[in-house]
Amino acid sequence: MGKPKGLCTARKLKTHRQEQRWNDKRYKKAHIGTRWKSNPFGGASHAKGIVLEKIGVEAKQPNSAIRKCVRVQLIKNGKKITAFVPNDGCLNFVEENDEVLVSGFGRSGHAVGDIPGVRFKIVKVANTSLIALFKGKKERPRS
């Protein structure tokens, strides 16, 4: 059968192409609008939040470790997320009720490595870079 040919087929070709686009995974993801609803950040790259508690998340098999994480409540929409605290000993710089800046953690919308269900990581604590605190370049501001 094939596609229609002729002088008056432009509308038919156009509408057919528009309908078929929705079968493309990338097009559907970009245009369906769930990015704003399902993503806790609401489409943004970073978000600020308040630390609720420190938790240890057990690593998946075959690894055996307790990954240091924190529960964070986002300021912009009140959603609660779990965020990973990178580097050895950086959990000591994070305290409850601190304001932290959270970013995505690698694979967009998916957990990374052996940490189940953790999709975000801590970047700043009390407006100070976590890496600067870790390396000793800056001190934690007095609150």
Swiss-Prot record:
CDD domains, alphabetized: Ribosomal_S23
Subcellular location, principal: cytoplasm
GO molecular-function terms, A-Z: structural constituent of ribosome
Record PROSITE patterns: RIBOSOMAL_S12
Record's subcellular location: Cytoplasm, Cytosol; Cytoplasm; Rough endoplasmic reticulum
Pfam families: Ribosom_S12_S23 (PF00164)
GO (cellular component) term, any one: cytosolic small ribosomal subunit
Modified residues (Hydroxyproline): P62
One GO term of the biological process aspect: translation
Keywords noted in UniProt: Cytoplasm, Endoplasmic reticulum, Hydroxylation, Ribonucleoprotein, Ribosomal protein
InterPro entries in the cross-refs: NA-bd_OB-fold, Ribosomal_uS12, Ribosomal_uS12_euk/arc
Subunit structure: Component of the 40S small ribosomal subunit.
The family this protein is said to belong to: Belongs to the universal ribosomal protein uS12 family.
Official protein name in the record: Small ribosomal subunit protein uS12
Upper classification of the organism: Eukaryota, Metazoa, Ecdysozoa, Nematoda, Chromadorea
Gene: rps-23
